[in-house]
């Protein structure tokens, strides 16, 4: 059993490779309870996303703009998001669709 199982599950709930291609997501990183990534240019000016599994078995999404010195600016957080709402919340915040269908 991999300690990145949660990160892999989050990515599959977002749409897997379709999500990666549609959003320009790259530089994925995972921990025991989270997935983080850089995302492409979007209407919110966010370029970094971290999704964390919390103790209530729901997700917390943190969008921010990382500067070249890795400082976080314009941080927006959404808490207690269910797995079936991840893609809808992502689309609502960034304006990017996560798949064609």
Question: Can you describe what each PLM-predicted range is?
Answer:
Residues 1-43, 72-73:
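Negatively charged, low-complexity tracts enriched in Asp/Glu with abundant Ser/Thr
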Residues 52-56:
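Short beta-strand micro-motifs enriched in acidic
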Residues 67-101:
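Mixed-charge, Lys/Arg-enriched low-complexity segments
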């Amino acid at each position: 059993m991999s300690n990145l199982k949660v990160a892999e599950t989050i990515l599959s709930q977002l749409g897997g490779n379709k999500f990666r291609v549609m959003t320009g997501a790259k530089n994925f990183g995972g921990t025991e309870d989270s997935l983080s990534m850089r995302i492409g240019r979007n209407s919110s000016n966010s370029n970094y996303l971290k999704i964390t599994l919390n103790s209530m078995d729901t997700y917390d999404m943190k969008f921010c703009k990382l500067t070249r010195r890795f400082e976080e600016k314009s941080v927006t957080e959404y808490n207690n998001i269910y797995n079936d709402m991840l893609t809808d919340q992502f689309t609502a915040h960034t304006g990017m669709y996560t798949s064609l269908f």
